[in-house]
Amino acid sequence: MFFHAHPDDEALLTAGTMAMLAAEGHRVVLVTATAGERGLADMAPGEALGETRLKELYQSAAVLGCARVECLGYGDSGLSPKGGSAEERPDNAFMDADIEEAAKALAAILQEERADLLAIYDPAGGYGHPDHVQVHRVGRRAAEIAGTGIVLEATVNRDPLVRLLRLATRFYRFPPEFDVRTFESAYSPGEAITHRVNVRRYARRKRAAMSAHVSQASGGDSDRTLAVMLKVPGPLYRLVFGTEWYVRRDLPPGARLRHPFERWPE
């Protein structure tokens, strides 16, 4: 089972792994906490956007070979790094959800599916979105309740990312609100990563999953991250997006595993 905050998160971080496991014959289940109804798009935030993004989620899941898709029905906490003020957020914003209550809802699906593995986010929530941080908290607790044996935290090796961004600042002027230093505490350092999953064989499916999220390829005054990624040429795309990273906390930091179910020597 793969637990994400919003539709399109699955395509960015774990799509290759999901496609690989489905191709190997595993039953893959995708769960999102929200419908992403407060995301940035050319259409106004709200119920209509949420419905659109859920349709896109189902299209992405079909490409990846998912057997089941569920949404827990919490409200999208919005684009503000800290979710904005409580007055700006919906009453049922996921970042404000009772962790035990949300974890029980997720655990019920884990138990129903008899899931062997749950994929969530690292403690930083990747780049720090409050809904992503909540996915980590809720997912961890749900795995405890359900007795799920393997918990993988989807992440990115931030070491080469920070080096690349620092180099890019010499040649490219980023928007004023963009601060490379924020990535120094985002995602996970290379030494903490336990799984480096080669998903180059599934790059086309990963790209198709990204393409399914049409609403997230435009909106705002500048190029969206998803749109930029989809412009990367095929060979370079396989190189850049051909590895997916995970941290498994019950293994030694820096363990070098290449498959979610690979065993670490006792």
Write out the residue ranges for each language-model feature.
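Active-site rim/loop-helix segments in enzyme catalytic domains that contact anionic ligands
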Residues: 1-114, 141, 145, 247-250
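Metal-dependent de-N-acetylase/amidase catalytic core
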Residues: 1, 84-85, 92, 96-266
